Amino acid sequence: MTTRIKVDLRSDTVTRPDEPMRRAMHEAVVGDDVLGDDPTVQELEARYAELVGKEAALFTPSGSMANQIAVAAWTRGGDEIICGAQCHILEYEYGAPAFLARVLAREAPVRQGSPDPDAVRAFYKSGAFHSSRTSLLCLENTHNRLGGVIADQGLFEEL
């Protein structure tokens, strides 16, 4: 007998915690994360840093916040970023790259859930004479507006 599990990858907002998850949230030891006193957040950040092979990790309560921190950290005011068409940063984050990081977002056509590498090459700007500098390529996986499609890993590698 085959068991089918439905996984909805459109957005983190469509997830629903089951009873064991709710129990874990209820029983979690908490503290003030701003003061560095929340052991649950500390454990989560340490586990994730180890998982991805980094020195440290930062918990953010939303994907939008994580996106905007990354954009601000990897760019300077006046830079350009390239995003895939209909990506979350462009469609659902209220112009935050322009407002918070002071960068212009360019929208590249998407192929199989990924910005098209040929379009990205065509849009890239070095920052030479009278042009802004492309400083960041934003990749979304899974692609929200395309129904949660998983981006083609080969295209990501090409980028």
Regions found by a protein language model. Give the residues of each.
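N-terminal amphipathic/basic leader segments beginning at the initiator methionine
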Residues: 1-24
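Solvent-exposed alpha-helices and their adjacent loops that cap or buttress functional pockets
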Residues: 2-3, 49-52, 73-75, 98-100, ...
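Conserved N-terminal alpha-helix of the aminotransferase class I/II PLP-enzyme fold
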Residues: 17-63, 85-91
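Conserved core of the PLP fold type I
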Residues: 55-75, 108-109, 141
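Conserved PLP-anchoring active-site segment centered on the Schiff-base-forming lysine
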Residues: 73-94
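Active-site-proximal loop->helix
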Residues: 92-104
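PLP-dependent aminotransferase-class I/II
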Residues: 101-158
